[in-house]
Design a protein with these regions (language model features):
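Phosphate-handling catalytic interfaces
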Residues: 165-198
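Active-site nucleotide-donor binding segment shared across nucleotidyl transfer reactions
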Residues: 57-110
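Charge-rich, solvent-exposed alpha-helical interaction surfaces
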Residues: 20-23, 119, 252
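Conserved catalytic core of two-metal-ion nucleotidyltransferases
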Residues: 119-164
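N-terminal regions immediately upstream of nucleotidyltransferase
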Residues: 2-58, 257
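Short, conserved charged micro-motifs
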Residues: 110-117
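Eukaryotic intrinsically disordered, low-complexity regulatory regions enriched in Ser/Thr/Pro
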Residues: 179, 204-207, 214-257
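Structural boundary micro-motifs
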Residues: 13, 17, 197-199, 203-211
Length: 257
């Protein structure tokens, strides 16, 4: 997880990338991500059959997707995984079902969640709620869950570093999609977070699928498959900022020794 995280931060210490990448390749060669139970169907969660909004999930998907795109947020969940599946053989591609299941990065997650809630309410949907979830140490920031009735449709996270992404265009609209290294760093963190809303097996399958995409297209370095992008979302701590923070804390605490 830490190695993927380091490779996903273009404003970090990039001088270490070559060494980290060599070690990561060696690790993946000997201990690849594998789960024999994984299939190639959609990894996104659909609504339950008895859900009051079962017949409206395609409309909710369209509204949520357009709202998140228009806000310029970075996709890294099931929707992003589906976009990467286009670079696999046809038999291994995932069906593009309109399941409203999004994970995105936003530098203003509360505002982004509120905007999405308002768009859904403007379309006539009731019981739209925003639920704040606690973070997990310095790995996962506090995040917002958006629900329509009992169904979760999105999680919006604040980045804890500057995470890399690529920009693609679909029907003339720019869409920000996290790099595979960014996505894997989050997925592996979710697996060990021990939260009830993180399906460990599902996330492991998503991580395995992304690893397959990356290995099959490792020589492709353009568009969505560009691995080392300079575009990133969030604020990255630098050596200078760490030293400044250390000096501030020293001045603040020196009289309490």
């Amino acid at each position: 997880m830490a190695m993927y995280l380091e490779l996903s931060r273009p404003k970090g210490d990039v001088s270490r990338w070559e060494k980290v990448l060599k070690r990561l390749n060696l690790l993946n060669k000997n201990y690849p991500l594998e789960n024999a139970r994984c299939g190639y169907n959609s990894f996104r969660r659909g609504f339950e059959n008895n859900s009051p909004n079962k017949d409206n999930q395609a409309e909710i998907y369209d509204i949520a997707r357009e709202s998140l795109i228009s806000q310029g947020l970075v996709f890294f969940g099931g929707y992003a995984n589906d976009l990467y599946s286009h670079y696999m053989p046809k038999r291994q591609r995932k069906k593009n079902k309109k399941f409203p299941d999004f994970d995105v990065l936003s530098e203003r997650p509360k505002i982004s969640a509120t905007i999405l809630k308002e768009r859904l309410e403007d379309a006539g949907f009731k019981k739209v709620k925003i639920s704040l979830k606690k973070g997990v140490g310095e790995v996962i920031a506090p995040h917002y869950e958006i629900l329509v009735g009992p169904e979760t449709i999105a999680f919006i996270y604040e980045p804890l570093a500057c995470h890399s992404y690529n920009v693609i265009h679909i029907k003339g609209k720019p869409i920000k999609v996290a790099t595979i290294d960014t996505m894997l760093s989050f997925y592996l963190a979710f697996i060990y977070a021990n939260r009830p809303y993180y399906d460990r097996d599902r996330i492991l399958c998503m991580a395995q699928y992304l690893f397959m995409v990356q290995q099959k297209n490792r020589l492709e370095q353009k568009g969505l498959l560009r691995r080392f992008s300079i575009n990133c979302v969030g604020t990255q701590d630098t050596l200078m900022s760490v030293r400044e923070h250390k000096a501030e804390m020293y001045q603040k605490l020196k009289s309490k020794r």
